[in-house]
């Protein structure tokens, strides 16, 4: 296991590289270039600047999250080939900088979705919540305004405002795209990009839909074991893999996360993992909790044991954390709770390793 920590860059993050460097066991950061418009080539010069900044702090930059996929590719529009060529060139540039894994998603219009970015918990901490009944009661425009207000000026990953400017127009285009068509468009994209990944030794890791069900009638296609397996078989290359995000897949209690880790891990197709916990509050409703098992609805010991059992040597990062101890930061991405999550993950890994050494 290689423990990494998401970082949004000097311009966009309240957390510094110096602080990340002091978290025990963290080897590197998961970075991105947030000022490059979606669909444009990431210049090698800018990638190298990011790499040099990270390495000066004593950390590595081997995982990128995310190189966003242009909406024209998801929609299957005639312009998609131009954007696919740009994506391929970005992968080549990332490879030159030593990047090993690129996380991406194929969610239409919206990235991850929450209805409250500042839910107050009894202990005074703040967390993010998803209440499906609120989704059913608002328009997409109203929800965007709510997210803007709750972001407190931070640009949230996947919610870059330039992507949402043509919301109504984009929704209209998706009226002709069902789950099957979206899947076809994803396969079309991968059939052209994966050969470049193979040439450059860069692995693609698709992030599951968050949450793993349809919202506002938009199709969702990476939601469970069955449709993930279908995608991996459709483009059957070890470079076509997944980001095992237990918070996204785990929002559906029918998804058995340890089982999925063992299944896809034995196939060698888990290239990256996000580990976090959440608490179910009703059907299709939950809020995010601290990482320890007793705080949420998932057993983190069993999750980490599954990774250990398959001999996982890939990248893992603590995912969304609460805002605690008065911290003002991007919702889900403060320093303190994610640092606690990182040490909890590391502690579980050490305990599992030593249990096996002594008793197996």
UniProtKB/Swiss-Prot annotation:
NCBIfam families: PRK03906.1 (NF003027), uxuA (TIGR00695). It is an enzyme of class 4 (lyase). SUPFAM superfamilies: Xylose isomerase-like. The lineage of its organism: Bacteria, Thermotogati, Thermotogota, Thermotogae, Thermotogales. This is Mannonate dehydratase. The gene is uxuA. The keyword Manganese applies. Catalyzes the dehydration of D-mannonate. Its EC number is 4.2.1.8. GO terms for molecular function: ferrous iron binding; manganese ion binding; mannonate dehydratase activity. Pathway: Carbohydrate metabolism; pentose and glucuronate interconversion. It catalyses: D-mannonate = 2-dehydro-3-deoxy-D-gluconate + H2O. InterPro entries: Man_deHydtase, Xyl_isomerase-like_sf. It comes from the Bacteria. Its cofactor is Fe(2+); Mn(2+). Keywords: Iron, Lyase, Manganese.
